[in-house]
A protein has these predicted regions:
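Cleavable N-terminal signal peptides of Sec/SRP-targeted secreted and luminal proteins
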Residues: 2-17
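Mature extracellular/luminal domains of secreted and GPI-anchored eukaryotic proteins, especially small
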Residues: 13-157
Length: 157
């Protein structure tokens, strides 16, 4: 199922223009398309570099990212700084929690789990000083831990 969804989204991205992608990112983050395009241009990130799913969880804490991954990390850092989610190489977890609370209609136990994961991932990148590395590792940490939580909840049900 996961591979089917990945293939589906890859095909969608392949058929979408740069402007379409920038517009969707801007809309989901409540930013302007110009702000997103500025981050694309500033970091030299391209759509074909958006393969963060290829970075395995066990390599997340130990690896030195290749140039492509660094560009994507810098792109995420740029977006995060424009949105107020990051200041330099520091993640503003309280802002993220507030943003999630005000925009998502989740059950309290789901929010509690998500907030705990946000805190755990922030602790994992706290000692890092490179904003590109921080943003990429933080996002990947959150994705991996949320997926693991979701899988374990589905198994339990």
């Amino acid at each position: 199922m996961k591979r089917t969804l990945l293939l589906f989204f890859t095909l969608i991205v392949a058929t979408m223009s740069f402007e379409d992608i920038a517009e969707r990112i801007a809309s989901s983050l409540e930013m302007t398309r110009e702000e997103v395009q500025t981050c694309f241009h500033k970091t030299n990130a391209t759509l074909d570099l958006m393969q963060i799913d290829e970075i395995s969880e066990d390599r997340l804490q130990t690896m030195d990212f290749d140039n492509s991954a660094v560009k994507i990390g810098c792109f995420f850092a740029c977006l995060g700084q424009k949105k107020g989610v990051m200041t330099g190489a520091r993640v503003n977890v309280d802002y993220i929690k507030q943003f999630i609370s005000s925009h998502k209609k989740a059950r309290p136990n789901q929010l509690t789990r998500a907030f705990k994961i946000l805190d755990t991932c922030a602790d994992q990148v706290r000692s890092k000083t490179n904003e590109c590395e921080v943003s990429l590792k933080y996002i990947l940490c959150f994705i991996y831990k949320m997926e693991r939580t979701y899988r374990s909840n589905n198994i339990d049900e």
